[in-house]
């Protein structure tokens, strides 16, 4: 029985990952409106109108409070989505069903790419089953990866491209031109998905340099590297044409932010193998969490030291990305580390292997009371994999009971219907997710004074320091906003806006900001 399971072990691992991620998926989407912009751009690849979207979104981003997002996202991921949008559209799939199918396409392709990761691990660990299996399930079964299956963002797609690049980098080709073209294409698509895809060129340079020192053969390395560099730079140039405003954040870089981000990302990555336990430690005994994080990074360094020359290419890519994340003022969360996790898990498992050989196994052998079967590599690896699976299962069970469809809930759908049917085409709306409202209704939407009430729930305005009502209305009218959409949750305060209500349901209220836009007598109320 065990031999049969071992024969199909990788299929079983991927099947479990498919079920785990699938249980986390919900029809619709959570609030984050990055996905709405991705879908909007993907739709433009099918129907046209990208220039119009750029103009509209640029206006929205420039006039909204704070930095909401770029004028356009890099086109790699929207183009990927557009193929599936067209395919599912031909099958008649629309609405929330389309979003659900796109989630499966996004996650399913990542699972397919994990086959390349498996082949890469086989090369890196020289066929050592225990290390390969543990490193593989640490990615395939991890709760954060399964959780990401419920989001239409470029995280898994970009991580998959990086995995394919490194697998291709170490794979022999019959001809240099075919390998160079493949690597250059991957650099282009990765950089066209996220700007830090350009760091793959750094890893490529290191790989070729080390291989040159070993073989002393120049061959066509210079031409290959030039092809890859040109591909990456062209992708950056194409994205720069979108006028991305994210570079404004670089003005906020300071030493305090860098130190803070350094600690945040060290803790975040160091908590990855024992994610749920780390969350518990963070709430109860934070010093123990830092001890666990320290152990992780010690093992990563130890694993790095024991690997072959391929480690330098991986290490350069990890350090370049870590450097970018640390100096970037906005903390992005675990999803941005997805690209680095395949490498960190290789080093982490490598460090575990060294520790097991030098300390773990000798200690176990001295414990005569422990059964011999529990001292085997298969048992220890299986136990560690079970811990990862339990964490993933906890997340999947939690998501089956959680309705993550915030962006298309019944209440917000009522707002969309009102805006679509009652608001003039030239109406200007203020909503906390402007790109989502624009994608659904097609109307100009801005994020202006949408935090009104959030920071002052249950507090006097003088205590909270939040935006006052008069200041909010003045700001809205100065920006020529016609309709102000607020959630009732954020309006749990003493002073509610003294503006005409034109629409109201259990979750949201739409106020007419302009003095001639409506009155209480003609408002629409929905139970």
Which stretches of residues belong to each language-model region?
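Perimembrane helix-loop-helix junctions
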Residues: 1-4, 171, 175-176, 200-232, ...
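Signature aromatic-anchored transmembrane alpha helix within multi-pass, membrane-resident enzymes
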Residues: 9-11, 130-137, 181-185, 223-232, ...
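Transmembrane alpha-helical segments
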Residues: 22-23, 27, 197, 351-354, ...
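Multi-pass, polyprenyl lipid-linked donor-dependent membrane glycosyltransferases
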Residues: 33, 101-109, 137-164, 169, ...
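Loop-to-helix entry region of an early transmembrane alpha helix in multi-pass inner-membrane enzymes
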Residues: 71, 75-79, 89-112, 148, ...
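Hydrophobic/aromatic-rich transmembrane helices and adjacent perimembrane loops
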Residues: 148, 155-157, 161, 190-193, ...
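Membrane-lumen/periplasm interface segments of specific transmembrane helices
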Residues: 207, 219-297, 387, 391-394
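Extracytoplasmic
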Residues: 398-400, 406-425, 432-479, 491-506, ...
């Amino acid at each position: 029985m065990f031999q049969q399971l071992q024969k199909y072990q990788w299929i079983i691992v991927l099947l479990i990952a498919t079920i785990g991620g699938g249980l986390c998926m919900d029809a619709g989407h959570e609030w984050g409106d990055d996905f709405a912009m991705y879908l909007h751009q993907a739709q433009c690849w099918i129907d046209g109108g990208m220039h119009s979207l750029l103009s509209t979104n640029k206006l929205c981003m420039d006039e909204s409070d704070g930095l909401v997002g770029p004028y356009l996202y890099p086109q790699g991921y929207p183009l990927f989505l557009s193929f599936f949008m067209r395919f599912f559209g031909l099958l008649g799939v629309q609405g929330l069903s389309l979003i659900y199918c796109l989630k499966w396409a996004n996650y399913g392709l990542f699972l397919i790419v994990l086959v390349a990761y498996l082949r890469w691990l086989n090369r890196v660990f020289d066929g050592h089953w225990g290390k390969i299996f543990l490193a593989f399930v640490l990615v395939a079964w991890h709760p954060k990866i399964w959780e990401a299956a419920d989001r239409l963002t470029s995280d898994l797609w970009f991580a998959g491209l990086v995995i394919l690049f490194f697998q291709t980098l170490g794979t022999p080709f019959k001809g240099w031109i075919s390998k160079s073209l493949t690597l250059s294409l991957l650099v282009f698509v990765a950089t066209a998905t996220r700007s830090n895809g350009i760091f793959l060129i750094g890893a490529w340079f290191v790989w070729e340099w080390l291989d040159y020192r070993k073989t002393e053969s120049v061959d066509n390395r210079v031409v290959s590297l030039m092809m890859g560099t040109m591909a990456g730079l062209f992708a950056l140039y194409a994205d720069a044409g979108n006028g991305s405003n994210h570079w404004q954040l670089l003005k906020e870089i300071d030493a305090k932010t860098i130190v803070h981000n350094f600690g945040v990302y060290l803790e975040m990555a160091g908590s990855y193998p024992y994610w749920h336990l780390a969350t518990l430690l963070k709430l109860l005994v934070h010093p123990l969490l830092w001890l666990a994080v320290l152990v992780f990074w010690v093992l990563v360094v130890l694993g790095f030291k024991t690997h072959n020359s391929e480690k330098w290419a991986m290490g350069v890519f990890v350090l370049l990305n870590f450097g970018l994340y640390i100096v970037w003022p906005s903390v992005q969360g675990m999803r941005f580390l997805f690209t680095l996790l395949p490498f960190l898990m290789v080093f982490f498992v490598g460090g575990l292997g060294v520790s097991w050989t030098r300390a773990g196994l000798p200690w176990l052998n001295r414990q005569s009371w422990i059964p011999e079967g529990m001292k085997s590599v298969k048992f220890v690896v299986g136990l560690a994999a079970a811990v990862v699976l339990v964490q993933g299962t906890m997340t999947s069970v939690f998501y089956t009971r959680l309705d993550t469809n915030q962006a298309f809930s019944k209440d917000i759908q009522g707002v969309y219907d009102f805006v679509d049917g009652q608001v003039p085409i030239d109406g200007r709306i203020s909503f906390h997710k402007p790109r989502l409202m624009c994608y659904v209704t097609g109307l100009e939407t801005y994020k202006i004074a949408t935090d009104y009430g959030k920071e002052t729930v249950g507090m006097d305005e003088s205590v909270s320091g939040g935006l006052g009502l008069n200041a909010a209305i003045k700001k809205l009218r100065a920006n020529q906003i016609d309709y102000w959409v607020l959630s009732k949750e954020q309006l749990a305060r003493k002073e509610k806006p003294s503006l005409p209500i034109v629409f109201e349901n259990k979750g949201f209220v739409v106020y007419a900001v302009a003095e001639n836009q409506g009155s209480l007598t003609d408002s629409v109320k929905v139970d």
